[in-house]
Each structure stands twice: as structure tokens, then as C-alpha cells.
Amino acid sequence: MSKDVIEYSKLFAKLVNTNDDTKLDDTIASFLYYMFPRELFIRAISLLESSDMFIYILDRVHNKEGNEHTSLIDVLVDEFYKGSSNSLLEYRLIVKDTNDGAPPILVDIAHWFCSCEEFCKYFHEALEKTDEKVELHDVLINEVDDHLQFSDDRFAQLDPHSLSKQWYFKFDKICCSHLLAFSILLRSSINVLKFFTVNSNKVFVIAIDNIDEWLNLHINIVE
């Protein structure tokens, strides 16, 4: 399905019921179910409701006594939805692996990467299918340099701040439930973000204001 026709982020934005913001819209959810293979959408929603997703923020400014959680959500809103962040936000998207003893899963929607086995599997398959004469970049990334063809879709978009070109990762070739879940959360709407982080409190936003703890987080991921 062409990204010129379907704007996935706008569909994600409609996931929360407009008449009751404590519920998901079943019609939109059913529609999205058929738009992704391997039951990816169902697995992504299950992940969002699993309490296994975490957003860690290196927080030097907003970690105040009192309304800390709300202020952290505001930081995410500024970064992902308003584009009004005054400085580069340092954050990490982490999923707790359900396998005992396995390291946490690192998710990077900005560069369309995930450390999970599913992502690695499809990435290696793409490598094996790629002709040596063809650049992997051309196989996995859709580059748009015609302004008339620019899209408002933010799903699987790389470097969204560029004014001269747009790049989209071809998610139909490589996608996993972790990337889809965090994209639904951070590339949709403020209502969807707050639905999972505040209303249902299933996705946890955690501030780290100590650089040693921040570095330790990365060590745990590598291990």
C-alpha cells in the first residue's frame, strides 16, 4: 500500500474513541488490523497494554517535586507533537523482554531500528534478497524529493525536520510489534499518547536525572 494514499499516523490518531477517551475505537482498530501482516497490529496493541513498555528521559529540567508525571508527558508532547522543545531531548524507548534473563529490548523509531529477534530476522532476509549491484538504502528507504509528493504521514519517517526531502523506511519489508507500538504512541496524537501513559497508565514514563544511572541503563541493554 502506497504511502501517497494512506497516512498511517492519522489513522493511529483516531484510535481513541472520540465520544469516550477511556476506550479505543473498535472500528479504527479493526481497520488497522487488516493493514499489517502477521497480526502485527494486535501484537502492538497488546504490547501497549502489557505494562512492559518504558520511556526513559534524561531529565535535567522537568524533574520537580509535585506534578512530575504530568510534566514528563508535557516534555514528550513538546518533543513529538508540538515540535516546541528548546533542546534536543535525550530519551530511550525500552521494552521488557518476556523471556527470563533476556536483556531489555531497545527501540529507535527515529532511525527505524529494534534490537528484537523479529527485526533482525527480517533485516537479514532483506540483505539476502538484495542484489549486490543495488544499494541497501534504495531497497529499504523511500526517498521523496518532489515537494508535490510530500506527505504529512509521520509513520516510519526518517529525519522529519528536513525541508528539502522526505525519507520513509519501507516498513512493509521490516517491522516488528515494538516499532509499531511506539509509533502508535509517539507518531499519532496527543490523545493517544495520554490514553496509554495517563488514562490507562500502561506505558511508563520515567525520569533519570543522574548521569551514572543513565549510563547504567545503556549497560543493562547491552548485557
Curated annotation (Swiss-Prot):
Quaternary structure (record): Component of the SHU complex composed of at least CSM2, PSY3, SHU1 and SHU2.
Protein name: Suppressor of hydroxyurea sensitivity protein 2
Main location: nucleus
Family to which the UniProt record says this protein belongs: Belongs to the SHU2 family.
GO biological process: DNA recombination; DNA repair
Keyword Repeat: no
GO cellular component annotations of the record: nucleus
Described function: Plays a role in a RAD51/RAD54-dependent homologous recombination repair (HRR) pathway to repair MMS-induced lesions during S-phase. Required for error-free repair of spontaneous and induced DNA lesions to protect the genome from mutation.
